[in-house]
Amino acid sequence: YKWIDKKFSDEIKFTNINPDFIGINSDIKFPEKNHRNNFKKINNSFNWKSLDFKFVKDLENPKKNQLFYNPITDFNAYDGLILGFRLHNKTFKNKPSSVNIIPLYSSLEKKLIGTIQGIYNFHNEESSNFLTQISLRTQTYHYAPNLRYSTYKPTLNFVFRPDDFRSDIRKLLSFSWLSVNRDRSSSVQTDPNYGIGIIE
């Protein structure tokens, strides 16, 4: 741990210090909007951070990629008792991207079911369309004995706000497509699959 005092320069050169990582404002003593990019791992070409698993949602640690897990129990008529967990990276502060993975086990069908969702946010503070969001959600369960259904829902959201930043008014324009794929039942002759376009 070494404090380097260098004034009036945009470039700092390090020699023979062999660091594990380089941090700027590492103790967060100075307020800033985004401190996620304040740490650079050395000898890591992808700048991957180590994973930190937490049971309860916590304050963000900019040195690590945090994943939170929670146990889940549920029940429905075709899957019976459902057991599993939720794994996600959402913290109290909004992130550019988030994942939500929910692997579950159907006690009645003895098979894996669950949900996966990924969201990516594009922020533009200079525009009334200050947030554009792309997401993909897929899930699979059973709708009859030994018959599975799966849904896929890509979504594109445009979020608008007025020029007055003190206003809490928000407007949303949303485009999504819901695709439903079902295992074919011998008792039903029609195609069980369908898709729906949604504009909100």
Region roles according to the model:
Residues 1-26:
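Beta-strand-rich binding/interaction modules
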Residues 123, 139-141, 161, 178:
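Generic surface-pattern signal
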Residues 12-14, 25-128, 146, 153, ...:
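Outer-membrane beta-barrel initiation region
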Residues 1, 21-23, 99, 130-136:
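Short, well-ordered strand-loop elements centered on a beta-strand within folded domains, enriched
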Residues 141-145, 182:
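A short acidic, often aromatic-flanked loop/helix-cap motif at beta-alpha or helix-coil junctions
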Residues 127, 132-141, 156:
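A glycine-rich helix N-cap at a beta->alpha junction
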Residues 174-185:
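Large, well-folded core regions of big proteins
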Residues 132, 171-173:
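Low-complexity intrinsically disordered segments
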